[in-house]
Amino acid sequence: RRQRQMCIRDRAPHPRPLPQAVPNSFAEWMNATDYDFVITHPEGYELAPQFVGNAKVEYDQMKAFEGADFIYAKNWAAYAGDNYGQILSKDREWTVSDRQMEVTNNAFFMHCLPVRRNMIVTDDVIESPQSIVIPEAANREISATVVLKKLLESL
């Protein structure tokens, strides 16, 4: 694994319980790379072990962000036991803000969009030069076009 190339998957607050599809697929793909991968979230929001893989799970968000090169914020509902599909915490301390970004390695901020501003991430972070959410969205368009082209070619 590369040194200092760290990607953090951060569970941010959200008013509704959202599925774990994006966090699970992101974790699965990150585990196939040579990046150090850390998942941070409040206790009770664990992802399925088969997707967490070799990722480090850190419940202290500030500790997880230390020295990170990329921050990818996303929200998801609880997975395990009687709490399945529930929102266990709406703690705004988990909103990605300058406070957390200051301890990173000048990390790039990512989110799959659309995003609830000032709930998932503050305006200061998403509007900063370190935010790459628009190029990220543009890449999704290209990826979808390529997949559609391949599907149509196979008909």
Go through the PLM ranges and name each one.
Residues R1-I8:
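Short, small-residue-biased leader/transition segments that mark boundaries at the very start
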Residues R4, D34, G67-A68, N106, ...:
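Short, well-ordered alpha-helix to beta-strand connector turns
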Residues H14, G85-S89, P135:
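Conserved short-loop catalytic and cofactor-binding motifs
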Residues R9-A73:
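Glycine-rich phosphate/diphosphate-binding loop of Rossmann-like nucleotide-binding domains
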Residues Q50-D124:
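Rossmann-like adenosine-cofactor binding region
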Residues Q20, N24, E58, T95, ...:
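Electropositive phosphate-/nucleotide-binding environments in soluble metabolic enzymes
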